[in-house]
């Protein structure tokens, strides 16, 4: 057992502590977001620097759509300043291996990555006007698929995907989410919304971004339920659609 592991509280003990605190809250307090009060059940000393970092890695892996073969992680702000002391580095790697914040293997993520054959390297991110708990992940999957993710840890174990391959995204991975990169031309939005309507899938939120008129654009569509894989493949074949990335809650 290395010195790093002593930073962590055993998850079951942490959960019991939280239940004890919750039992003392009155009903009005219980209406608050519990994560805002005491944070998630997790392995690690910080909901922002550890639990949120695990979530960033986990969601990024799912967006890549396959196991990560290699990754470059560029830390920014307080992530960079306290990355080792709060276990942010190990937490990110743990998430990229598919671990959740309460996984007892989080302190040993580097060793687990070696077993899995996943290589990783850390550096400093050069970002402007970014959240202080930000990271850039440049991932390569087993098939050779690549994806760049810029993400931020918001506190309480919550996180946000800020950009995908340089395009705005801004979603928190709390719904099944379609990220559609397309040409900015008439009909692309209708193609996506019509397909979802035919599938009986309600749209929770819809964000649209473009770099210029007629240039590159992106749709971020948070859905009330999962989108079937065959429908995603169908979307990718439509005129004007360049790439579809999907975050599944399953």
Task: Put a short name on every predicted segment.
Residues 39-57:
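Conserved phosphate/anionic-ligand binding catalytic regions in large, soluble enzymes, centered on
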Residues 122, 150-250:
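A conserved regulatory-domain signal marking ACT and ACT-like small-molecule sensing domains
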């Amino acid at each position: 057992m290395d010195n790093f592991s002593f930073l962590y509280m055993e998850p079951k003990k942490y959960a019991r502590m939280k239940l004890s605190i919750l039992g003392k809250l009155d009903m009005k307090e219980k209406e608050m977001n519990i994560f805002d009060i005491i944070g998630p059940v997790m392995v690690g000393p910080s909901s922002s620097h550890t639990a949120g970092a695990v979530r960033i890695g986990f969601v990024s892996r799912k967006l890549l759509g396959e196991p990560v073969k290699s990754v470059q992680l560029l830390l920014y702000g307080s992530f960079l300043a306290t990355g080792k002391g709060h276990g942010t580095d190990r937490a990110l790697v743990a998430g990229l291996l598919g671990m959740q914040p309460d996984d007892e293997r989080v302190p040993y993520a580097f060793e687990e990555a070696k077993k899995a054959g996943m290589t990783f390297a850390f550096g400093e991110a050069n970002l402007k006007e970014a959240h202080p708990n930000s990271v850039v992940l440049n991932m390569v999957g087993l098939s050779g698929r690549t994806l760049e993710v810029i993400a931020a840890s918001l506190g309480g174990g919550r996180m946000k995907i800020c950009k995908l391959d340089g395009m705005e995204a801004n979603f928190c991975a709390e719904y099944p989410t379609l990220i559609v990169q397309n040409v900015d031309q008439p009909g692309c939005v209708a193609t996506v919304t019509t397909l979802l309507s035919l599938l009986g899938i309600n749209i929770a939120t819809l964000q649209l971004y473009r770099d210029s008129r007629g240039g590159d654009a992106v749709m971020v569509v948070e859905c009330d339920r999962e989108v079937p894989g065959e429908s995603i493949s169908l979307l990718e074949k439509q005129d004007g659609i360049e790439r579809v990335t999907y975050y599944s809650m399953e």
